[in-house]
Curated annotation (Swiss-Prot):
Localization annotation: Cytoplasm; Nucleus
Swiss-Prot/TrEMBL keywords: Cytoplasm, mRNA processing, mRNA transport, Nucleus, Repeat, RNA-binding, Translation regulation, Transport
RRM domain location: 51-129, 139-216, 232-309, 335-412
GO biological process: mRNA 3'-end processing; mRNA transport; nuclear-transcribed mRNA poly(A) tail shortening; regulation of nuclear-transcribed mRNA poly(A) tail shortening; regulation of translational initiation
Function: Binds the poly(A) tail of mRNA. Appears to be an important mediator of the multiple roles of the poly(A) tail in mRNA biogenesis, stability and translation. In the nucleus, involved in both mRNA cleavage and polyadenylation. Is also required for efficient mRNA export to the cytoplasm. Acts in concert with a poly(A)-specific nuclease (PAN) to affect poly(A) tail shortening, which may occur concomitantly with either nucleocytoplasmic mRNA transport or translational initiation.
Compositionally biased region (Polar residues): 1-11
Organism: Debaryomyces hansenii (strain ATCC 36239 / CBS 767 / BCRC 21394 / JCM 1990 / NBRC 0083 / IGC 2968)
Protein name, UniProt field: Polyadenylate-binding protein, cytoplasmic and nuclear
Region spans: Disordered: 1-46, 511-537
Family matches, as SMART domains: PolyA, RRM, RRM_1
Amino acid sequence: MSAADANQVQESLEKLNLDSAPVASTEETEQTASGETEEAADSAQVSDTSASLYVGELNPSVNEALLFEIFSPIGQVASIRVCRDAVTKKSLGYAYVNFHKFEDGEKAIEDLNYSLIEGRPCRIMWSQRDPSLRRNGDGNIFIKNLHPAIDNKALHDTFTAFGKILSCKVATDDMGISKCFGFVHYETAEAAEAAIENVNGMLLNDREVYVGKHISKKDRESKFEEMKANFTNVYAKNIDLDFSEEEFKKLFEAYGKITSIYLEKDHEGKSKGFGFVNFENHESAVKAVDELNDKEINGQKIYVGRAQKKRERLEELKKQYENTRLEKLSKYQGVNLFIKNLDDTIDSEKLEEEFKPFGSITSARVMVDETGKSKGFGFVCFSSPEEATKAITEMNQRMIYGKPLYVALAQRKDVRRSQLEQQIQARNQMRMQNAAATGGIPGQFIPPMFYGQQPGFFPPNGRGNGPFPGPNPQMMMPRGQIPPPQGQWPRPGPNGQPVPVYGMPPVYGGDFNNGANGGRQQRGYYPNRNQNQKGRQQKDLAAIIANAPADQQKRILGEELYPKIVSTGKAQEPEAAGKITGMMLDLDNEEILALLEDDELFNTHFEDALTAFEEYKKSSEAATAEN
């Protein structure tokens, strides 16, 4: 390096000595392979024609409009996109800004990089779509043991003296606190080598930093396995608290030459009972582990084993827990039964008595709440699958204390949830196929501002014959609605849910006339409708609907219905207003227009839909509680 370059490096290092108070030291952190911390490793050289920028470290509240205000003064912006989660639609914390001119992109990086956006310093670099170039780590370096006060900008200012930086990042936790390591990606490998040569081992903010080439996760893992097989560092615990460091060393030096030793102590200088010993060669470390592990010293059995990093220990414990859990599950596979619909008087002893005739029971338990009252379900575990199968065959639907039992093999919660999702998906596919065969999806419209409602929104009744029987005093026809022709009542679908008769208006529960008269109703949908009394606003809306495309008509009507439903104050739950709106959108457009004009007619239909929603919610909650 020239004398001028050396002076520039020295100035950058001096600037980095921040005045902030030092914080508690952290463990030496190894290179991580997380997606967030390797973003710097993923960046690469950019072509001269590119004008697309990656903007990271964004506050979740930042949107496209705010970014346009910030970047548009630089030059003409072609497009801006904040990347969001596909399900929750929440910001992922980064965005792409596209300029028409490459020069504008360069200026944006120069002027706006690390500037505050909603209280957070943003990180801007060229977007590189080619994954092979993004993973090219020739110019990427890794820095660890950084001072916690060093941020992205301070790191960038220090290392920019060695060449053009494509990306620079200090790794942080979820709270935005530095993890004391980071990455710098240079445009050329030569610049990276110069940075390593000049900064590695230097003091930055009173800390000696390590600077080296970034190693990919795959290479790190292979190297880590090699280190595990040839370890020299040993961890010992359960050491006598009266042991001094000299005695601790004497305990291990008989097995080989020691390069370093450390006995952990508290703030008063007393031993914490554990420490580390590093041998010169692997054989000495293995010998110490073999001969000292589980050896009794001063009346205590000590543990001696290969020293592990915290992350490795946590992963190992997690694997052990998972293996134990799977072993336990496989042990009870096919022998553990779930029983529900139990009478409140049945306790664990009575439950065991009922199932005892079918085989040897290892455990039986009725689940109770905090007051000791039965929850109405329990578990019985047999010694063999054959006994469990026999119990299911004999006891399922058997009347015990006046209630039919439900008996089946017990399932894990995640398995039950997966099966339920599959059943829902299958029903949705069946409904879509049936709808496609009739040329549309009646009763299913989801405006962008609220949730729609599935057709035939009715809870199953308790009679077991579906929710739409024929002449039944308990079933009513909607006020003013023409009944379907004979034989066109909706048939029950899966789980008792009704499948709507296409081409017929949907049936809602609520304020109905008695259906025992065979469904004879006054013909005509709008008994209170008066065309001459329509207001100017309603005529305008009718004209808009008439001129709007067919696929937009329901959306327009939904935007009129939704605030009217919310204004009633009765749809208190978050999803209630949206679902009720979706139900009412199943009506014909003319009838919806009449509802918007006639408050009395609107209230009648609203109460019907609200009643149906509440009944459905109660049945859903009951089904969830049983499961």
